A protein has these predicted regions:
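A cross-taxon signal for low-complexity, glycine/charged-rich
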Residues: 1-16, 24-31
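Active-site-proximal alpha/beta segments of enzymes that process anionic O-linked groups
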Residues: 33, 46-224, 231-238, 488-492
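Secreted, luminal/periplasmic, and some membrane-associated catalytic domains
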Residues: 34, 41, 48, 55, ...
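Structural motif
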Residues: 38, 225-229, 286, 448
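Generic recognition of well-ordered alpha-helical segments
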Residues: 59, 370-377, 446, 468-476
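Low-complexity, glycine/alanine/valine/leucine- and proline-rich hydrophobic stretches
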Residues: 413-460, 466-468
Length: 493
């Protein structure tokens, strides 16, 4: 397979920095039809794109050098869902009512829902463009399963069961996709695995097929706006960061996978180049990520801590490591419980709100403030402070639709993750309760803008936010951003 051969070549030469790189090929003459292409790279780390690997990524380097670029701030929390939709609606997670992949469905103790496309009720860029008669094609923009009607086409994201499901709109678009890429993957089967070589192979195969589909859409469809999101970057970081980062606590010097992230980035740039060479001079290009990546030093067992502090009371001692929902909780004595992930959410047990609420409403803010102070004081495993941030949703969002968590916890500036499981018998853990995972998300992503008719001279942009993406796209089509969008069109020149 072409992509894997390219990767092997990169592995052989990557450590010497000798990878051959062709310059960006000239574009086709202008067609007179203004278009915008977005290449989304889930989790792409700005320090790698703008610094460490930049010289070996000639296609992105060309966009950067002739365009405008900068770091872009993600949502709080910096999580794929809702970050991509915050970018494309210019609404914060509270306004969307989506605080992560899993959200409370009601005020019971058990019922949660996974935020799929139906959870997003705010209009996105393509909705506004569709009303103006413009056609959009979307590839893997989370969350996009089930696919929604759009003036154009939509291919479901990694939340789709597989490519055999009804993961496209219109439904017959699926047949076209499978003709172009018969083994199309919406995601790799399991990125938290010890079989690293098999994972790496699947990431390459998946990404190559995604770009085959993007090129097909560029060439064969009538479109004004085309956007893709490549999830392979995220899966690569979570699976291979310890090999790439010498400061990672689990780094393995000399491991054969040492250059796995480097080689993929260089190869990915070639895939991007294959798309760029199909574009005319009336197509503006944006490349951005929803957040960045950084090493993960370890995990903090939020529910173990809540037990030790007397906030969470169990009816039984766990036998082994188990999720909270598998343990009997004494809700009549419990004041708070938490969930794990790349960040934590803490929920309070409030009288008149939860079925067995114990915190009087008059004490709600006092308990929240008490928890904030205590959680921020949790040290690392050596007793050192770790710069944890704890947020009240009502203070960081413009609205809090649906059921927000009572507290959002960012442990150790995202160098630490939250572990919700019980039975660890320790506050700190260095094994992921959901499988091997080397990286956490970073607050800053990357942004590149390129207009082939304007040489912006590689201007560095500052103070960018994900919320600015939607107004920027609308401006490219001569449309004003609706007044309820919270971002602003990025001034690139």
């Amino acid at each position: 397979m072409e992509g894997i051969q390219t990767r092997k070549g990169a592995e052989e030469q990557g450590s010497k920095g000798e990878i051959a790189s062709a310059p960006l090929r000239p574009r086709s003459p202008a067609s007179g039809k203004k278009r915008v292409l977005i290449i989304g790279l889930d989790c792409a780390e700005p320090s790698l794109v703008f610094d460490k690997y930049r010289a070996e990524m000639p296609n992105l380097q060309s966009l950067i050098s002739n365009g405008a670029w900068g770091e872009i701030e993600s949502t709080t929390p910096p999580i794929t869902v809702p970050a991509w939709m915050s970018a494309m609606t210019s609404k914060d997670p509270g306004q969307l009512g989506v605080y992560g992949f899993r959200n409370r469905a009601d005020y019971s103790y058990e019922k949660m829902f996974t935020a799929n496309s139906r959870a997003i009720t705010e209009p996105a860029v393509w909705d506004y463009l569709g009303r103006a008669g413009k056609q959009s094609y979307l590839v893997g923009v989370p969350p996009s399963f089930p696919p929604k009607p759009v003036n154009g086409g939509m291919i479901g994201c990694f939340l789709s069961p597989n490519a055999q499901s009804k993961f496209t709109y219109p439904e017959n678009l699926r047949e076209e996709i499978l003709r172009v890429a018969p083994n199309y993957l919406v995601d790799v089967p399991n990125f938290r695995t010890d079989d690293k070589r098999a994972l790496l192979q699947k990431i390459y195969e998946m990404t190559e097929d995604h770009f085959k589909v993007i090129k097909y859409l560029v060439k064969e469809k009538s479109w004004d706006f085309l956007m893709s999101v490549e999830i392979g970057v995220d899966r690569l970081h979570h699976g291979f960061w310890k090999y790439h980062d010498a400061s990672h606590p689990k780094h393995e010097p000399g491991n054969a996978l040492l250059n796995s992230i480097h080689d993929y980035y260089v190869w990915l740039d070639q895939q991007i180049g294959g798309v760029l060479e199909l574009l005319d001079d009336d197509t503006r290009v944006i490349v951005f990520s929803d957040h960045g990546a950084k090493k993960m030093d370890g995990g903090i067992a939020i529910n173990e801590w809540l037990i030790s502090e007397g906030y969470l009371v169990l009816e039984e001692k766990p036998q082994g490591i188990v999720p909270l929902e598998k343990v009997r909780v004494n809700w009549n004595k419990t004041r708070a419980w938490g969930s794990g992930g790349y960040y934590s959410r803490v929920f309070l047990n409030v009288q008149g709100r939860e079925p067995n609420g114990v915190i009087p409403p008059a004490d709600y803010e006092k308990v929240r403030d008490e928890l904030i102070a205590k959680i921020c004081a949790i040290p690392d495993d050596k007793g050192k402070p770790i710069a944890t941030r704890v947020h009240k949703p009502q203070q960081i969002y413009r609205a809090t639709k649906n059921i927000p968590p009572d507290l959002i916890v960012i442990f150790g500036d995202l160098y630490w993750r939250a572990v919700g499981s019980l039975g660890l018998n320790a506050l700190h853990t260095f094994e992921n309760d959901t499988g091997p995972d080397d990286a956490n998300h970073a607050q800053m992503g990357m942004f590149v803008y390129h207009d082939p008719k304007r040489d912006l001279g590689g201007r560095e942009l500052r103070d960018l936010q994900l919320y600015d993406i939607a107004p920027t796209v609308l401006r490219e089509f001569g449309m004003d951003a609706p007044g309820d969008m919270i971002g602003k069109a990025i001034q690139v020149g």
